[in-house]
Amino acid sequence: MDGAVAAPRERRSLAPSQLAKRKPEGGPCDEEDWRPGAVTPKKRKSSSETQSQECFLSPFRKPLTQLTNRPPCLDSSQHEAFIRSILSKPFKIPIPNYQGPLGSRALGLKRAGVRRALHDPLEEGALVLYEPPSLSAHDQLKLDKEKLPVHVVVDPILSKVLRPHQREGVKFLWECVTSRRIPGSHGCIMADEMGLGKTLQCITLMWTLLRQSPECKPEIDKAVVVSPSSLVKNWYNEVGKWLGGRIQPLAIDGGSKDEIDQKLEGFMNQRGARVPSPILIISYETFRLHVGVLRRGSVGLVICDEGHRLKNSENQTYQALDSLNTSRRVLISGTPIQNDLLEYFSLVHFVNSGILGTAQEFKKHFELPILKGRDAAASEEDRHLGEERLRELISIVNRCLIRRTSDILSKYLPVKIEQVVCCRLTPLQTELYKRFLRQAKPAEELREGNMSVSSLSSITSLKKLCNHPALIYDKCVEEEDGFEGTLDIFPPGYSSKALEPQLSGKMLVLDYILAVTRSCSSDKVVLVSNYTQTLDLFEKLCRARRYLYVRLDGTMSIKKRAKVVERFNNPSSPDFVFMLSSKAGGCGLNLIGANRLVMFDPDWNPANDEQAMARVWRDGQKKTCYIYRLLSAGTIEEKIFQRQSHKKALSSCVVDEEQDVERHFSLGELKELFTLDEASLSDTHDRLRCRRCVNNHQVWPPPDGSDCTSDLAQWNHSTDKWGLKDEVLQAAWDAASTAITFVFHQHSHEEQRGLH
C-alpha cells in the first residue's frame, strides 16, 4: 500500500513542474526529500545547436540570461529580480553616431562640456552646411567652451535622399537665409525649373533651421509656407513623406473665419524650444484674409510657393506678405524669371528689401540706362553703359537667386518625347471657320484698319471651333456674331448632346491615340484643356469608349483633389484617363501614374502650358514619357503657339487674359490672327524657312546635342510616320492619315536603356 502511494509521488517529483522543489547535492535542505539518483542527466547540446541560436540574435538586444545560472532556493523578491534580469535589454539608438537629445537629462545646473553638432559631420555622405573655423589648441584653451560654434549638418534621413544638385541648392538656401551670402540680407529666390525637387530642398532647409544652428540651438522656432490652395495638401503630404512623424505641420485649407483665426492664434502663441506644430501651411487667399493674426508675432521663415505671382508689388497679396514680421524669405518659382526689369525689382525687393535700392533709385541707376542702351538708335556710349549696368544688376541678383534647368533630370528620369502634332480641320470646321472670318465684326473692323477691344473676345470662338464644332453649336443656333446662317452647314439631325469625334480633326486624332494606347499598353493618359466645356467632350468620349476616368477642374474641393490624384497614381487603380483643367490645377500636381499627356489646346501664356506638361515627367516616373501638343494647322492655334516660341521679352508676348490682346499685338499681327491657311501643312514650319527640309521633307537631321529645350528649327520635322519614335502616334497616323499633316518631335536626352 505504501509503495503504491510512493510511486506516483516519485513520478511527480521528476516532472519539469517540480524542478523548483528538487535540491542540488550538498544543499542545505533535508536529504530525505532529495533523491539525486532519480534525476535524469540533461542531454548535452551539440555545438551546431548552440551556434544556430547565436546566429539569429538581434544586434539591438543582449543574449538572454542562461537559466543554468539560477541561484538556489529563491524567495519571491529574488525570483522577480531574477526574471527582470532575464528580460532586460539595453536600449540602442539605431542611427549611427547619433548625438541627439535622447540621453538622460538631469534637473538642476547645466553640466559643463564641449558643445557638439546634432549630427556627425564626419559620417559618410554627410551634408555639412557650416563648418566652424579651425582653432589651435592654445586658442581652444582661451575660448569659452560654451560659446564655441558647432557644425551644422543636414539630418542624415534627408541628406541620403538628396541628389547632387539638391545638396547644392540646400546649401545655397541656408547660406542666403543666414545672411552668409549677402551680409544683412536673409532672402533668396529658388528658381529651379519644374521637376528638380524644389519642395524637398525647402523642407530640408526648414527642418535644419528648426533643429540646429552654429550656436547649438534652433535657428528659428516657426516657419510659414504660403502656396496656391491646390498645393496646400501636397505640401502637407510632402512634409509627412520626408520627415515622417518627426514633425506635425498645421495645414489650413478650409473652415470658417473664427475657426481659422483660432488655429492661427494657437500657432502664433507657441513658444519654447520644442514647438508642437512649427510649420504652418496656408493658401495665398487665406493668408491675405487673415494676415492680421499672423502680424501679431514674429515668424522665423516664410516660403512662398509659385512666387511669380508676387511680381506686382502693388497687389494685396504682395503687400500682405511684405507686412509679415520676418526677414528670412524664400520665394519659389519654377517659371522662368521673365525678362522684365520691373519684375526683377519686385521679386528681389520682396526677399531682400533694399538690395537694389528704392524703386526710384532702381529706375535711375538700372532701368533707364539699360532700356536706353537697347534702343536701336542708341549711341555707342549709351549701349556700353547699358551693358555695364545690366551686368551689375545680374551680378547682384545672382547672389540671391539659384536656377538650374531640367536637363539635370536626364540623369535620373526616363526619356521624354515631345511631339507637336498639326491636325487638319474637318470640312465642317473649315466651312464654319471661313464663314466666321467673312461675317464677324472683328475681321471686318481689322480689314478697315480699326481695332475694337470688346470684339476681340470672339477669338475664344475660333479657339473653341478648333477644338470641336459642338462647342460653338449653341452660338450657331442663336446666330451670334459671325455664325449667322451657319446652322445648315451641320449634318442633318445633328445634336451636340452626342459627341462625334470625326467632326473635329484634333478630336479624331485624340480618339485614335487613346484607342491605340489602351489596346497596346498599360499606359495611362492625362488630357489637358483650357476650357471646362472641352473636358465635357472628353467625358463623353470616355463614356462612349468605356474608359474609366477622373476629372479635376475648378469645381473640385482641395481635399478631394488630393484623394483623386492619389488614387490615379496608384498602379492598381483601373482609371485610364485623368482630365485636367490647366486653369484649375496646372501647377504642382504630381501625376506620375500616367506617362502620356495630351495638351489639347495652347494657352497664350507659355508658362501655363509648361506647368501642365510637367505633370508626368517628374521625380518618381519610371516610364518613357510622351507629350502630345495638338494644334489645328493654319489656324489661330498655330499663331498662339508661335507667340509662345517667339524670342521677345516675355512681358510683351505673354497675354494673361484675352481682353488684354490689344496691349501686345500690333494691328498687322491681329490681322494675321483672323486668317486661315487651308493649304499649309504647318504654318509654323513655313515661317521657320527650314533649310534642313526640301519640299516639307526633312533631308538633314537636327544638330547633335539638340533636345526638347532647343528651338523648333532644331527639332525633327515629319510629314509622315517614318522617323517617329512613338509607336502609338505611328499607329494613329495610319488610322487618321488625312487628319495629321505635320509633326515636330524631339527627345529630352539620348536614351540609355531603350524605350519602356
Q: Locations of the language-model features?
A:
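Accessory nucleic-acid engagement/destabilization modules that flank
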Residues: M1-P149, I157, G266
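ASCE P-loop NTPase motor core, strongest for the SF2 helicase catalytic module
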Residues: D2-D33, S47-E49, S134-D375, I394-Y412, ...
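A short helix-loop-helix "switch/interaction" segment in the helical subdomain of ASCE P-loop NTPases
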Residues: S379-E388, E418-R424
